[in-house]
A protein has these predicted regions:
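Active-site histidine-anchored catalytic micro-motif
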Residues: 1-137
Length: 137
């Protein structure tokens, strides 16, 4: 069995945002066993799985990525879309645009402290589109 849905996430400011609930609300019923693949259709945002309990983790992740990839570097050629755009492309490539999660007994088989993150790398990224592909039985 294969299912695929595409949906829009609400607009968020730059940062790492826990979106597990929003993802689940947009999915059709899940099979008993299978895989959920999520793909974000943008080049300046990403998806990740990380801690869902302490919000300081999300703040720290933002700080780490801003330290790794700085804005306004003199060697950036792609600068027409703002100071945050080229760094957003680099951060998206580092973190990735897709994740895969196992489905067990009709539920996402995430660890106790795991949640799905939208990694928004633009100051004002706008609405983001996600393709969810479900396989299983």
């Amino acid at each position: 069995m294969w299912k695929q849905v595409e949906f829009e996430l609400q607009s968020r400011r730059r940062g790492f945002h826990l979106i597990t609930g929003e993802i689940l609300r947009n999915l059709p019923p899940l099979p008993k066993v299978g895989l959920l693949h999520l793909f974000i259709k943008h080049t300046s945002a990403g998806l990740s799985i990380n801690e869902n309990a302490d919000p300081d983790v999300r703040v720290d992740m933002e700080s780490i990525f801003n330290h790794l990839v700085k804005e306004r570097e003199p060697y950036y050629q792609h600068t027409l879309e703002g100071d945050d755009d080229m760094p957003a492309h680099a951060k998206s490539s580092i973190i990735g645009t897709s994740i895969t999660i196992p489905i067990t007994n009709g539920k996402l088989n995430l660890g106790t402290w795991q949640g799905i993150y939208l990694c928004e790398f633009r100051d004002y990224g706008g609405n983001r589109r996600v393709v969810a592909t479900i396989s299983g039985e």
